[in-house]
Amino acid sequence: MTERSTGLVSVVMPTYNSAEFIEESIQSVQAQTYRYWELILVDDCSTDDTELIVARIADLDHRIRYHRLAVNSGAAIARTKAMELAAGQYIAFLDSDDLWRPDKLARQLEFLQRTGARIVCTAYDHIDEAGTPIGRRVHKPKKHADYNDVLLSCPIGNSSVLFDAGTLGIFVVPNIRKRNDDALWLQMLKKEKYILGMSDVLMSYRVRANSISANKWSLVRYHWTLYRDIEHLSVPRSAFHIFVWGALKTLRIK
């Protein structure tokens, strides 16, 4: 296992054409009250000004590292590459359009130390493209999410997760275009029984009109790929999980 810097949090941020939002996301990392972090951005061959924006910020903050993939490969490959480059004892995920509260890392690290957990996520709210809160909706995770919980409803916000890479190592994100975050949590839960959830709202998830996850019903075939090709579930069990997932979407539970 790679030797890791004790106490360092490696923030993993895959990005693609995020020029409109990425500076605000980076600023939410720079605003953290916990100061011992590095930010690793892996660019999946952006064609907008993402690289220029990151370079300008990184020139003034050497905790920020930028890596550009040779070919456009998808978010899963970019996230895995960022984890490979990470040097920290802890790894936290942040998408390049989401935002953290200033005390996010500090409170998660305190929670890990107090509970002995190795993977933790938090509650989060929703903002629109302008950064305005959407209604009063807050997504709160389960206190203890296990493998079956993630299969049924994935009660985990990607940009809220922090885990102990010093003991768990890093993970290869399954290479599917959508729902690769769900697939990653399932990989983690084969090494750790639970992902623990904090009820504190420490992250804002940005809802974008052109997001590949905005149309929930278009995700059905990706869920099928996840269940059958990656997790190797039986046809009846896969169909059951898709039915439950669809019912939850219809009822607006998630």
For every predicted segment, state its role.
Residues 1-30:
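N-proximal low-complexity "stem/linker" segments adjacent to membrane-targeting elements
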Residues 28, 35, 43-52, 71, ...:
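A conserved acidic beta->alpha catalytic loop
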Residues 103-134:
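Conserved donor NDP-sugar-binding/catalytic core segment of glycosyltransferases
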Residues 7-10, 38, 183:
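Cell-envelope/extracellular polymer assembly enzymes that use nucleotide-activated donors
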Residues 20-23, 48-56, 99, 103:
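Acidic helix N-cap motif at the loop->helix transition within catalytic regions
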Residues 69-86, 107:
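Glycine-rich, basic loop-to-helix element that forms the pyrophosphate-binding segment
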Residues 91:
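Short aromatic/hydrophobic "clamp" motif used to bind/position activated sugar donors
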Residues 84, 136, 140-218:
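Conserved nucleotide-sugar donor-binding catalytic segment
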